[in-house]
């Protein structure tokens, strides 16, 4: 399997090269040359680690299958407490795919617990001996998951950049208290898009690359712009379908709709790959918060990033430039020149418009909707009071949009992307309780109000020493990269 750049299909690399490099030299994202077809029934009979290995080996063809099997078994075992890809009934034929039972209590663990193994093996496959500097822009969950996955990995240094004031306090503490000799964390003045743009500029700067190369260092990414982040996320769509099969809720071939809360479009794009591999995915419903740039695009074909930015109770979705949409545009248009022109227009003017036939092709699979802040709170309250189901703010966005897009007779799986205890103040307030300023007090009150127990990895943050408190401007990200001490 070869991988092409979305902006220049003549640039072809192996899976190992795509994972080591992260981003193509001209700024494009790597996409697979084809969609491998799998025996869905056979895959759905596997346990999660074996299922992951089966999907991974279809794309990572230059990796030893035995290595992939070992890596998947190590990743999705004890760290997920037997709940990898856990599907919970909510009400009727609506289900929650709980993706927050990993070490950092967010869906990013599925990729970022595995990705360090993939990177180290990719370098071995390629005979590469240089050090790797990983730069990560995060709106909350990716940062901690990447830090947890890469800390103390030999030959790797990782720097994470998050928007100051743009995460929950729990998310911030998860990053600020991270242990490891090869990690660094910076708050960036501005929003997530400012941090992400700053990181992308570093990747595109040939002078920085040359200076680092002189020190035997190469840049890479752990954001979902890296193929190694995206491919593990395909697996849990198969896992959800498999559980519905085993429960007798669907017969093989019956469609299942998925509603995904997303800002950067990576998690929902993984569902598109699963569909193209043969999984009977019906509709993929894109759920946005008040920063509803994706809703507008999927309805009109016009992408406008230059708009008001809102800080919401679902901060991991507070994004205006959705990087992974570029991959979908490539798959739908089949044209690298068209995608390159659209991305250039976005960079220059802050917007672009796709052709009507492109929008129509996208709308064959994708539906959309968004939730205002009061609707998010109302959804948290309704799911708890009516169904006894406790969810976080991002999942609540998806539940709201899922109800708008529910098709009679078709099961709906809502991707639950983070533990409700990551956002205890917002969840507590939504339940009509007084929400104290302190997140840990709120966590305790949420436990009392619901009878649920906060994950130990979150409750244990209380009182931990903060190691990182630097605040920088986006323009200083380049200096951070050049100052790394691998």
Question: Each predicted region: which residue ranges?
Answer:
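PLP-dependent amino-acid enzyme catalytic core
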Residues: 1-486
